[in-house]
Amino acid sequence: MIVTTTSTIQGKEIIEYIDIVNGEAIMGANIVRDLFASVRDVVGGRAGAYESKLKEARDIAMEEMKTFARQKNANAIVGIDVDYEVVREGMLMVAVSGTAVRI
């Protein structure tokens, strides 16, 4: 499945705009605290454990969005947006959304 932040896919014609699709992942109660504690693990200016958890949450949200698109018989998603939010103390949410299309 093609997933892009752009509104078009170069070299492809969008046959049908189907619906808005989204996916969310919330990292639980101790994740944010543990991640900040792991900042001590900074190597070369980057916090490896923190980046790993963000990537995991983003991957979960993206897969959920793709699943919803497939259920609607889409074969691509355009115009995706990725947002990161602290929903309350100790909880991080990654939300992705886009438009499911058929090319």
From Swiss-Prot:
InterPro entries for this protein: UPF0145_dom_sf, UPF0145_YbjQ-like
Stored PANTHER family: UPF0145 PROTEIN YBJQ
Protein family (similarity comment): Belongs to the UPF0145 family.
Name this polypeptide is given: UPF0145 protein BCE_5284
